[in-house]
């Protein structure tokens, strides 16, 4: 379930979900199931190597011997909607179970969220690639002064150009016009599970300033939804489970 009428309903659902998840996990370890996955070993190896190589210069570890600087990644086959590779952190030997950051550790998505949260909804609400938007400094309704990170402004620009230059102010203007409630509804329907009430309140959400953030699994599934003509498919690497 992805759609909730209130925060309390969502919290209650999550509690029941966690309880059932724990029960299923116990059964998984004791019932002798055969589990078939969509993981592609070659893609998995490449993704793990990409994460490890990108962070190889960061060697500091915590008291448990785990690297402090981490990353995650998720790769989805757009034809099937299945996860073919998922990396929850840097590869280490003899560590045992660690947090799978790909779906358990939200981080700020930054500008990567703009197409999912603002531009795709804009297209569904009558905008086109040629529609114009003001790319000039502005103040939002919640009193935030918004500027472009690169410090340049172009006045009236097309939606296409706004995406190309990743304009903060153009994105914010569209977000204000559509309203946070309208835009965030799209993330709700794609099961972005770390949304909070504050994310609906502050306009900086649309440029990646979430309270908790998103996961690489959520982001990959979101972009896979764009490729699938707007139809969301829940990301999973499980193909089937048998008892014999």
Place the predicted regions along the sequence by residue.
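Non-catalytic, structured segments within soluble enzyme domains
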Residues: 1-38, 188, 193, 204-208
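Conserved catalytic neighborhood of penicillin-recognizing serine enzymes
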Residues: 127-183, 232, 244
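Second-shell loop/turn segments in exported
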Residues: 30-38, 59-62, 100-108, 145-152, ...
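A short, well-structured edge-of-sheet supersecondary motif
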Residues: 64-95, 190, 239-240
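Short active-site loop at a secondary-structure junction
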Residues: 66-71, 94-116, 129-135, 204
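Active-site SXXK
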Residues: 47, 81, 108-133, 162, ...
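Conserved, well-ordered alpha-helix/loop/beta-strand core segments that scaffold catalytic motifs
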Residues: 18-64
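Active-site-proximal helix/loop microenvironment
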Residues: 193-244
